[in-house]
């Protein structure tokens, strides 16, 4: 892990990590993570920042039209689907959670468009709670190294929880 940490320090921070460190805002972490799915990091940064200039809270985002959100987040991958998802999440946060992003996996998974990776990222980067964000890289690399033998990212998360010391849970995704 020491070698990985040393090498990763030479690279720019992933945008979602950067936004979490700069803002400590679980809502911005959640929205940036949704934008990051199937999108290059530079595009995630560009589109997130453009969107947050227009609207940085659930109330502000919910007040925007879907087309306005689409325009702000283009060229993020699947921008039309993401625009609807972001608007619906914002409305649900206002209606059911008093505009506060939930701090549990179970509650986060109730949002359409939020999977385990996104939920874990919100917990780890938005709330500094323990969690393991497993994307395709973490799944593929840990299996290739022979650290685990799993068939899906969900299985990988469970297996890593059993063998990885908790001090590495939050950082494993950034390291790989």
Language model regions located:
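Catalytic cores of DNA base-excision repair glycosylases
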Residues: 1-176
């Amino acid at each position: 892990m020491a070698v990985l940490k040393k090498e990763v320090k030479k690279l720019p921070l992933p945008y979602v990590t950067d936004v979490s460190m700069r803002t400590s805002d679980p809502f911005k972490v959640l929205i940036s993570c949704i934008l990051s799915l199937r999108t290059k990091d530079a595009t995630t940064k560009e589109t997130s920042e453009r969107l947050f200039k227009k609207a940085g809270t659930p109330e502000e985002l919910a007040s925007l039209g879907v087309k306005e959100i689409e325009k702000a987040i283009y060229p993020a991958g699947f921008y039309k689907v993401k625009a609807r998802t972001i608007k619906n999440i914002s409305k649900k946060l206002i209606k059911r959670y008093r505009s506060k992003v939930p701090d549990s996996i179970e509650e986060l998974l109730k949002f359409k468009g939020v999977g385990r990776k996104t939920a874990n990222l919100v917990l780890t980067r938005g709330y500094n709670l323990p969690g393991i964000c497993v994307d395709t890289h973490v799944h593929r690399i840990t299996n290739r190294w022979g650290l685990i033998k799993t068939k899906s990212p969900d299985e990988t998360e469970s297996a890593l929880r059993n063998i990885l010391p908790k001090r590495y849970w939050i950082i494993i995704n950034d390291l790989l």
